[in-house]
A protein has these predicted regions:
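Active-site/ligand-binding neighborhood in enzyme catalytic cores
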Residues: 96, 113-239, 256, 260
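A general beta-strand register signal
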Residues: 49, 92, 229, 245-246
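Local beta-strand N-terminus motif with an aromatic residue
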Residues: 5, 30, 59, 254-255
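N-terminal Rossmann-like FAD-binding beta1-loop-alpha1 element of flavoenzymes
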Residues: 5-33
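Glycine-rich FAD pyrophosphate-binding loop
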Residues: 24-49
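Conserved Rossmann-like nucleotide-cofactor binding loop
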Residues: 15, 38-39, 264
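Dinucleotide-binding Rossmann-like beta1-alpha1 core, especially the glycine-rich loop
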Residues: 51-128
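Mid-domain catalytic core of redox enzymes
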Residues: 26, 232-320
Length: 320
């Protein structure tokens, strides 16, 4: 017997959980979330190891200027379930800690590299070559100059994306990268001060307990149990007949499929699929990573106590 569902949501990560909650909120009862793992949350999950350390495996710090999203976050953990931190992130390079963003704190670099970076900034701003940008590398060079790009932004982004910046476009940047305020930089140099307050997440909230995964675990628990099916992986999607077949052989007919799966995986499950789309889907680029957690017993060392996280752009270590 084929189960019939109006809204079938593929994936029980943040997007899938959000879709389900919104459907419930709108009074829609005819939906089902399919999640291949035996837990909800996707890559925004947190795990507790045998020693009691909590590890976030993907999504970590979040920030928002959307009232609805903020309301959902408060719904997840309540007003008292959060800690608020002032972001203090640092870069470990040239054998020293330098406050992030680098361009606002280049006076903390060795003298020769500081001069190279500052001169590169001024030259880049004077050139104003934004009309001739072809890729992410061009954008970095045009925005920050040769010095900052070569010492930090190019090697760091290659580590993060595992792909050369000259082969990436730059329309995704938005608020993710701090742009240049040359007058602010000059003031920091004159006053010899650290500048760490840039950005939309210069203060951020983090769950008191359970890591980032606590948010999505809580929100998933607000979905009616009958409306989320864990340990249920999609095997095939018959797009002509609107039928999903799961790995355990269950068939589900849907009116609307809301997919939160990676595009390449989604395309591999759809049949029939036009050959042109199928071949293009195999060319989609993506990166993967290994998450390594090291738990240290004892108090936080003084020189790390007020640092929220660190960036490692240099090639003398594999992590970033």
């Amino acid at each position: 017997m084929i189960k019939q569902i109006k809204y079938l949501v593929a994936g029980g990560g943040p997007c899938g959980i959000g879709a389900a909650l919104r459907l419930q909120e709108l009074g829609e009862n005819d939906f089902l979330v399919l999640e291949k793992e035996d837990y909800a949350g996707g890559l925004a999950t947190s795990f507790v190891d045998a020693q009691g350390f909590t590890w976030d495996v993907g999504g970590h710090v979040q920030f928002s200027h959307y009232k609805y999203f903020d309301k959902i976050m408060e719904k997840a953990l309540g007003k008292t379930g959060w800690l608020t931190h002032e972001r203090a992130s640092f870069i470990w390079m040239k054998d020293r800690f330098i406050p992030y963003p680098l361009q606002n704190n280049i006076h903390r670099l060795p003298e020769d590299i500081f001069k190279e970076c500052f001169e590169g900034l001024e030259k880049a701003l004077a050139n104003n070559s934004s009309n001739s940008l072809k890729n992410f590398k061009d954008w970095l060079l045009a925005s920050f100059g040769e010095g900052i790009a070569s010492h930090f932004l190019l090697p760091y982004n290659y580590k993060v994306w595992a792909y050369h910046p000259e082969k990436m476009q730059y329309g995704w940047i938005g608020e993710r990268v701090s742009v240049v305020d040359i007058e602010r930089i000059k003031k920091n140099i004159e006053e010899d001060k650290d500048d760490i307050s840039w950005g939309p997440n210069n203060t951020f909230q983090f769950p008191k307990f359970g890591g980032t995964g606590a948010i999505w675990k809580s929100l998933a628990s607000m979905i009616k149990p009958s409306k989320i099916s864990l340990a249920t992986e999609i095997d095939t999607i018959d797009s002509d007949n609107n039928i999903v077949t799961t790995k355990n052989g269950e068939k589900i007919e849907y009116q609307y499929l809301l997919s939160t799966m990676p595009l390449d995986i989604l395309c591999s499950k759809i049949s029939p699929m036009p050959e042109a789309i199928s071949s293009k889907s195999k060319e989609l680029l993506y990166s993967s990573t290994h998450i390594v957690g090291i738990g240290v017993e004892g108090p936080t060392p003084k020189h790390l106590a007020k640092k929220c996280w660190l960036y490692f752009p240099e090639n003398n270590c594999p992590f970033y």
